């Protein structure tokens, strides 16, 4: 069994720390990767972080994860509310999936309240800032280890 966890991020998350810091905070995607790698390493896992502003590239990463990852943490960002393609790709992945959002999407605009990804996710974290990624990695480690 592989011990790699894919952490997939959707559009505009490359601007984390710069774009709307009042909502998303001041930490960057590199900070997310560093923090998640440390959490995973404590449990004997590794992470592979990927970000794209393109839906098809995220779908391709999910397809790759079918062979290379034990679990997926995904923040699909705006694709959360629109992407049946990402949902379908996640249905083809057999391991655990945790959906993660930095902000509490349920306290924001009503169009953000619906998630296609939640139809496949084993758990959803929203509103914990980037700490939510760490919580998601901990849970994926547990699920991949059989817990």
Swiss-Prot record:
Disulfide bonds: none annotated. Catalyzes a trans-dehydration via an enolate intermediate. The active site is at residues 24, 101. PANTHER family: CATABOLIC 3-DEHYDROQUINASE. NCBIfam families: aroQ, PRK05395.1-2, PRK05395.1-3, PRK05395.1-4. GO terms for molecular function: 3-dehydroquinate dehydratase activity. It comes from the Bacteria. The keyword Amino-acid biosynthesis applies. It comes from Cereibacter sphaeroides (strain KD131 / KCTC 12085) (Rhodobacter sphaeroides). The gene is aroQ. One of its GO terms (biological process) is chorismate biosynthetic process. This is 3-dehydroquinate dehydratase. The record marks 19 as: Transition state stabilizer.
């Amino acid at each position: 069994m592989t011990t790699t966890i894919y952490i997939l991020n959707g559009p505009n998350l490359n601007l984390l720390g710069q774009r709307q810091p009042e909502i998303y905070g001041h930490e960057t995607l590199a900070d997310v990767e560093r923090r998640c790698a440390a959490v995973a390493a404590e449990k004997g896992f590794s992470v592979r972080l990927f970000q794209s502003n393109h839906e098809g590239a995220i779908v391709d990463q999910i397809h790759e994860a079918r062979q290379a990852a034990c679990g997926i943490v995904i923040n699909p960002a705006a694709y959360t509310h629109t992407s049946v393609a990402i949902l379908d790709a996640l249905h083809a992945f057999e391991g655990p999936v945790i959906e993660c959002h930095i902000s509490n999407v349920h306290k924001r605009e009503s169009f953000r309240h619906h998630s296609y990804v939640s139809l496949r996710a084993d758990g959803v974290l929203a509103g914990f800032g980037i700490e939510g990624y760490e919580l998601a990695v901990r849970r994926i480690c547990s699920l991949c280890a059989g817990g």
